A protein has these predicted regions:
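C-terminal hydrophobic helical "lid"/dimerization subdomain
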Residues: 16, 20-34, 65, 244, ...
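NAD(P)H dinucleotide-binding glycine-rich loop of Rossmann-like/cofactor-binding domains
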Residues: 129-215
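Glycine-centered, small-residue-biased loops immediately flanking beta-strands
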Residues: 304
Length: 366
């Protein structure tokens, strides 16, 4: 069996990366074996392995033929061994939780009107228990028993096929109603979903004459700028980063103002000029370092909100006096739920969301 004919899509421009794996048209499996890129040792390159194709053992299960799988920083944390204590998994492990593809096989109890073989689907990655209060209210991704593909005992999508524990975790994308491709859908399941939920949490604070800042224009920030425009009801969108090239990307998707934090001695002074002394009403921190939170607090308006989605740091520190006196709100936001993924895909169908993708072979995955 030849594994190297898979394609790896990557969007990279001066350090901004969104990766997807797309199966090549000429890939041929041998028997019941499939190809997967797996972690054998933390901090080491992924290895291309021949493994057994997953089989259905439960009536709700579905096998998806992978069309594309995104690589986000959570995967890199896993591959590098940064999360051995937070998310212990048995090795070897196939990473990849941003997955889109086609239904290959369905279990016996999957309703016929839900999905069928051949359907294009996006895989929702928060596989909750379905019974707890969080799952019942629709927030499966924060279920205490949630399993994530590639980040739990379930293997992920750096493979030809993915076993999904229930059809309920699949969003069917009607091919007749959209020109979306798997490589466009895959990043939406996390990189495109996480900032959407975060902005939705605080959209009541936005509107005309309001200001929202996106700190960190990587994969999450790239989408975050777009959602701030879509959901902000006329609010000014400020993009903050250390790279002029990334800030140019932000301008291209709707940022009204850009600030290179590396070149500013007093960012609050610049913010005051832009906002006429008000400060920023909402900050989306896609980085999650102490320095970015300090920046967020420094530029925040009274009664403003900071939503943290980045996981680069280890702890959050906030000034108690300012937080109380100015009624700051500081909250975390994890991923997004199934219904929010459906909303994101609908926006993508209407071409409200921009994508940038390149391709190269899986043999260059490392």
């Amino acid at each position: 069996m030849q594994c190297t004919v898979l394609l790896l899509d990557i969007f990279t421009r001066n350090g901004f990366i969104v990766m997807t794996i797309q199966m090549g048209k000429n890939l041929e499996s041998s028997g019941n074996n499939i190809c997967a890129a797996r972690i054998h040792k933390y901090g080491s390159p992924l290895e291309l392995d021949d493994i057994r194709k997953p089989t259905i053992s439960s009536p709700e299960e579905v096998i998806v033929r992978v069309g594309a799988t995104g690589l986000c920083h959570s995967d890199l944390h896993l591959i590098n061994g940064d999360w051995q204590k937070r998310l212990p998994v048995s090795l070897p492990k196939t990473p990849g939780h941003e997955v889109a593809g086609w239904v290959e096989e369905i279990g016996a109890s999957v309703p016929k009107n839900s999905i069928k073989e051949g359907d294009l689907v996006a895989v929702f990655g928060g596989w909750g228990c379905g019974h707890c209060i969080y799952c019942k209210r629709g927030d499966e991704q924060i279920c205490q028993s949630a399993k994530w593909p590639g980040l739990s005992e379930y293997d992920g999508g750096f493979s030809e096929y993915l076993l999904v524990p229930s059809y309920k975790f699949l969003v069917r994308v009607d091919g007749r109603a959209t020109s979306l491709k798997p490589e466009e859908l895959a990043p939406l399941t996390d990189a495109g979903l996480t900032p959407y939920r975060a902005i939705k949490k605080v959209r009541h604070l936005l509107g005309p004459n309001k200001n929202v800042a996106i700190i960190g224009i990587g994969g999450l920030g790239f989408y975050g700028v777009q959602y701030a425009q879509i959901l902000g009801s006329g609010a000014n969108v400020l993009a903050i980063d250390r790279s002029d090239d990334k800030l140019e990307l932000a301008k291209g998707v709707g940022a009204d103002f850009t600030l290179n934090i590396a070149m500013l001695e007093g960012i609050r002074k610049k913010i005051d000029i832009i906002t006429h002394g008000q400060g920023v009403d909402v900050v989306l921190d896609t980085v999650g370092l102490e320095i970015t939170l300090d920046t967020a607090v420094n530029i925040l308006n009274r009664n403003g909100a900071i939503v943290v989605v980045g996981l680069f740091g280890r702890e959050i520190k906030a000034p108690l006096f300012q937080t109380v006196i100015k009624e700051f709100q500081i909250q975390g936001s994890l991923w997004g739920n199934y219904n929010e993924l459906c909303e994101v895909i609908e926006l993508a169908k209407k071409t409200k969301i921009k994508h940038q993708i390149k391709k190269f072979s899986l043999s260059k995955v490392n």
